[in-house]
């Protein structure tokens, strides 16, 4: 069990580091940038295989938590979290004032809907936790688990649990990509060619270094 948890933590940490590597804070001036990549996605549906990692690495997807460059667990779309003594109830406070890249507010209700979509559609979720239900209580999201999980915050740092806007038509998400909260948003996607992401004008966490990035 400990080895499985450690692997999940390392995987989530790597995903967070890849995202930060794509989005430097002060190296590049505004404009366009081209980055060569060796790993591509067949689809931008985040629940398919491990393609959520690509979505996060491209600076589009974000989750409730993340790992910093030193491997420390830090807040992202959640500002804080607590757990019950039995480890079966986890409460995450959702960051206020965050918008998706289309300008829609990221509400706790939409966070819940996004997570429930992932839980319903991905067969990888049981590798992380055994969920009973998710509730909204004001600005909080409450996870009710069937079994105790001491590493719930680490599990949610995995890109699989990125938060996307489920209030819009996502019928063509495989090509359009999810609408998320990261510094960039998808402009175009070619599974056998280039992918272009553009600056998210609603980004909540500081300046975005480039107008667009071609990958």
Predicted regions and their residues:
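Surface-exposed binding/hinge segments that line
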Residues: 126-167, 188-190
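Gly/Pro-rich hinge or "lid" segments in bacterial periplasmic/extracellular proteins
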Residues: 157-208, 212
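N-terminal lobe/hinge region of extracytoplasmic solute-binding protein
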Residues: 36-85, 179-180
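Short, well-ordered beta-strand elements
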Residues: 30-40, 89-92, 111-114, 141-143, ...
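Aromatic- and charge-enriched surface segment that lines or borders ligand/interaction sites
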Residues: 79-121, 142
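Hydrophobic core
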Residues: 14-22
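Sec-dependent signal peptide cleavage junction
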Residues: 22-32
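Bacterial N-terminal signal peptides that target proteins for export
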Residues: 2-13
């Amino acid at each position: 069990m400990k080895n499985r948890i450690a692997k999940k933590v390392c995987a989530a940490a790597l995903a967070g580091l890849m995202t930060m590597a794509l989005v430097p804070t002060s190296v590049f001036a505004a404009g366009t940038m081209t980055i060569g990549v060796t790993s591509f996605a067949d689809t931008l549906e985040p629940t398919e295989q491990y393609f959520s990692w690509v979505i996060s690495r491209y600076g589009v997807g974000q989750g409730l938590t993340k790992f910093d460059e030193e491997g420390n667990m830090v807040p992202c779309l959640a500002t804080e979290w607590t757990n019950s003594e039995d480890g079966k109830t986890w409460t995450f406070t959702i960051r206020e004032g965050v918008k998706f890249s289309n300008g829609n507010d990221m509400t706790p209700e939409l966070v819940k809907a996004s997570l429930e979509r992932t839980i319903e559609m991905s067969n990888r979720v049981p590798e992380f936790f055994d969920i009973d239900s998710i509730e909204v209580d004001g600005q909080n999201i409450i996870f009710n688990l069937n079994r105790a999980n001491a590493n719930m915050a680490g599990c949610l740092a995995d890109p699989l649990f990125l938060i996307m806007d489920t209030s819009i038509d996502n019928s063509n998400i495989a090509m359009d990509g999810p609408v998320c909260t990261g510094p960039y948003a998808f402009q175009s996607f070619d599974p056998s060619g280039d992918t272009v992401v553009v600056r998210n004008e609603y980004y909540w966490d500081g300046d975005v270094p480039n107008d667009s990035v071609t990958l």
